[in-house]
Amino acid sequence: MPPISWPTGTAPGVNPTETGGRLINAIAERAPAGSRSEIVWRRVAGLIARFTTTQTAIRGALLVGSVLYVVSGNRVYSITSSYVVTELTGTVGGSGPVTMARNMKAPVPDVLIVHSGGMSQINISGASVAVFSDGDLPSVNSICWVDGYFIVTAESGLAYQSGLNDTTFASVDRTTAEADPDGLYRAIASGSDLILMGTASLEFYANAGNPTAFAFNRSVVVPIGLKAPYAVAGFEPGFADTVIFVANDNTVRRLQGYEPAPISGPDLNRLIEAVTNPAELVAWVYQAAGHAYWVLSGPGWSTTFRPAAGTSARAMVFPIGAAATASPPGASGSPSTSKAARRSS
């Protein structure tokens, strides 16, 4: 009898008669030479709870040296490598996910946070967080750091740079992403590139060392945009792949140089299209057992991509919002606490 064709990815189809099979909490690997099968199936990495905060949800985190700074609810916590948790004094405004960045100021770096209510600054030496404001900045919606500069973006399409390893901004040190009148969702740094991401275009900038105004010059424009502010990941330090994002055409795309190559299939494209509030799409990354993973979570579902293998799997164990809260599957506890976890291979 013919061998059973086991799936190597997730392709459920619209109805059972067209399904290509599904991998749930599992990945397919090519077997070593001489094995009885060309493919082996392994479970995906799990989660181990490591610390608990007193707030309801983790909104964002940033590693500064060996200390992790976590925004949870309206509080900020520092977590050491031995999982000692310290609550910083002060609060963070806004709601929902935040973006965070640090510079290379010596001996103590600056850390800035952008949230829906404005900006905040972490004082590492003082173990505190407070409102950050600069009269030269409008209302901003994201932050990143590249080549010594904080870069913040505004929905209007403006991007501002800070002083070199400083938190001061000048109204003239800015540029406008004007290849398309789509505004800006995010600024991210990928290698030596600054990428300004609008709803219908990506603009790549390179550091030209301009002595006045914006230090970066635009180099490449890609006519594909970002569907939602938090639907992009892969630019994080140490991630062994490249930037992957949900595009404005409801596909998942992987940057190969300046080419955003689609990597999602029709099933996931339909799932993305059905999301009524794109802000619920959250992407994140992790690495385990030598594999790099990119995860997209929507309302009630998560899908994992292994970019190097070109395969995907469905992660059914995550509760709604797991990508944003980093809560372990099935985590228990009172509603007033939030648990954070690390991957286990």
What spans do the regions from the language model cover?
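N-terminal beta-propeller domains
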Residues: 1-86, 139-205, 209-210, 281-284, ...
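Surface loop/turn motifs at the tips and blade-to-blade linkers of beta-strand repeat domains
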Residues: 50-54, 89-94, 132-137, 175-179, ...
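A short loop-to-beta-strand structural motif that recurs across blades of beta-propeller domains
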Residues: 75, 118-120, 201, 251
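A broadly used, surface-exposed interaction patch
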Residues: 79-113
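Acidic/polar residues in short coil/turn loops that connect beta-strands
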Residues: 82, 116-118, 124-127, 146-147, ...
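A short alpha->loop->secondary-structure connector
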Residues: 87, 124-135, 167-172, 211-218
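Hydrophobic or amphipathic alpha-helical targeting/insertion segments
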Residues: 101-133, 152
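Beta-sheet-dominated scaffold domains
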Residues: 105, 110-112, 133-134, 185-345
